[in-house]
UniProtKB/Swiss-Prot annotation:
This is U5 small nuclear ribonucleoprotein 40 kDa protein. Component of the pre-catalytic and catalytic spliceosome complexes. Component of the postcatalytic spliceosome P complex. Part of the U5 snRNP complex. Interacts with PRPF8. Component of the U4/U6-U5 tri-snRNP complex composed of the U4, U6 and U5 snRNAs and at least PRPF3, PRPF4, PRPF6, PRPF8, PRPF31, SNRNP200, TXNL4A, WDR57, SNRNP40, DDX23, CD2BP2, PPIH, SNU13, EFTUD2, SART1 and USP39. Component of the minor spliceosome, which splices U12-type introns. GO terms for biological process: mRNA processing; RNA splicing. InterPro entries: G-protein_beta_WD-40_rep, U5_snRNP_Component, WD40/YVTN_repeat-like_dom_sf, WD40_repeat_CS, WD40_repeat_dom_sf, WD40_rpt. Keywords: Isopeptide bond, Methylation, mRNA processing, mRNA splicing, Nucleus, Repeat, Spliceosome, Ubl conjugation, WD repeat. It comes from the Eukaryota. PANTHER family: U5 SMALL NUCLEAR RIBONUCLEOPROTEIN 40 KDA PROTEIN.
Amino acid sequence: MIEQQKRKGPELPLVPVKRPRHELLLGAAGAGPGAGPQQATPGALLQAGPPRCSSLQAPIMLLSGHEGEVYCCKFHPNGSTLASAGFDRLILLWNVYGDCDNYATLKGHSGAVMELHYNTDGSMLFSASTDKTVAVWDSETGERVKRLKGHTSFVNSCYPARRGPQLVCTGSDDGTVKLWDIRKKAAVQTFQNTYQVLAVTFNDTSDQIISGGIDNDIKVWDLRQNKLTYTMRGHADSVTGLSLSSEGSYLLSNAMDNTVRVWDVRPFAPKERCVKIFQGNVHNFEKNLLRCSWSPDGSKIAAGSADRFVYVWDTTSRRVLYKLPGHAGSINEVAFHPDEPIILSASSDKRLYMGEIQ
């Protein structure tokens, strides 16, 4: 009787079987770089799924080529290429569309690359390294045009100014936050912090540097007055990632207390600047610097996590929209595409994934 019922099944309206999400993701690994549609049989499962919403060759693309943990990844502002770097000291440049070819490798650092950033027009790429330097690269030619030396220990973070003269701020294990003008050899300003600095960013107008580190506090330094303006407290463990929203009003922070927070960094904001707390992602004993990022329109945020999942939250409701599997190691950075609904993740499993999100 049961067998007969089973045979009748197909006459019912066809409802897609809910497959475990990890099967979907890992199935698509076959549809990664170099796999044409005819080879990617597991990927066909995804093709038959939800309608496509980006120009990626497949809904999920795997980028493999690094020889060590991948710590950072960023899309070029024009959205057609991306950069990744990590423990192997190399910066790899990739095409976003087509087969996602690794079309260039930038060599020059003698230590792990901890963070990468393009400047606003994408003409320059900045990289912070454990070799105590920050390198400035011409993103067209791949040539290193400048090396910023002055830190006495690992440089954990760098961030280029969004507008005005090309300034860059850096944070290091030597406990300092430095401001550089790339036309000059030495740092223009140095702010002394008691403990290691793990993450830095500018405010929107680039007259303040915001830093986070192992003292759990987020500090805002005024470049005109050359002093600490205010401190934002709330995290109960080291702050590992900072990201400013695209319109510059809000700051996102990721910390080892397993929370991601949003802070109001507008001038004259109320004294209690923490406006939202997000939970779900985790940090662990590996103590990797897990970063965080905003979607271009500010409606979503994403953060690295040590549990091998990519977390994406809705900014308004604070709900986890996506918990994406597929990686086999800590996810150290997640980046949103500037124009399309694509998310990029860099992991300790030496791989990067690009995937569509609705």
